[in-house]
Amino acid sequence: MHLYDEGFEPPKACAEWCRARPFELQVLDDGVTVDLQWWNNHLDDAGHEIRLRGRNLDGRIVGTGTAVVQRNDLRLGSDLIDADHEGLGLLFLCAAWRSAHPRRKAVRRFPDVRDVRTPKGRHPLAKIKGVLDYCAKTKGLPDTSRQTWSGWPDTPGVGVPLMATYLWAVEARTDTGPAQMLDQYGVSTLVHEGWLEDPSVADFTVRRYHRYVELLNTWAGLMSTRPELVEMWLVDRWHARVVEARDGSQATPRLF
């Protein structure tokens, strides 16, 4: 464990919240409403052979309009993905889920994953597909520490939070534990609670991400819960602070 993290224990409210919630219901069933038309139109315009789907209120799979995508759908072989490349289809489903989440710090943005510096004769999607395939096959990140300043592989159009979501979806592991989602709201809560680290997730290096994952797993172990629940509490906690600051006395009461 990082020297600065020794003795940094989870807040009591975090422990109470996590212990009171089942992983399957709270995490895996975490659903959002995705505008399939928007995403599929952008996929068509970009020339991708990918179609995203969702479920209607009856639970049936649909491919048009708005539909629900649950966190449990973020996996290879998902029924909600029809794609010529499984990893790339999953990446776009992760992007759609993240951007539609009402409590996470994300905006709807279509990732341009083409490599604009592609050498002649090489497909512009070869780089991103190669990284995604490697992560899915090996359950880890390629070692690019000598090629990029951050340690992250070169993934055109894909930021750290989206990459972390993909790593969680393919059940990847890091040097410090299972990969976890990374959200600005969650890190803001950690810093507010006393974590001594740079608060910007966009600037997270791989080493900093490993430290973050280790902290979540350590807290989960102390509370006999799952790190995904810890991450969710951190995100929801900051979202609750934002709502309270915005709405004041009109804010919905929360267990914090």
Where in this protein do the model-derived segments appear?
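A structured, charge-rich N-terminal accessory region that forms the first stable segment of a protein
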Residues: 20-83, 95-96, 103, 107, ...
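C-terminal accessory module of base-excision DNA glycosylases/AP lyases that mediates lesion recognition
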Residues: 1-59, 171-256
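Short hydrophobic alpha-helical segments that form membrane-spanning helices or hydrophobic packing faces
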Residues: 163-169
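Helix-hairpin-helix/helix-loop-helix acidic hairpins
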Residues: 79-86, 91-155
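Short alpha-helical scaffolding segments that buttress acidic/His motifs in well-ordered protein cores
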Residues: 91-95, 166, 230-234
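Short, charged/polar micro-motifs that form catalytic or ligand-binding hotspots
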Residues: 76-84, 149-153, 172, 176, ...
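Amphipathic alpha-helical interaction surfaces
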Residues: 97-104, 169-172, 192
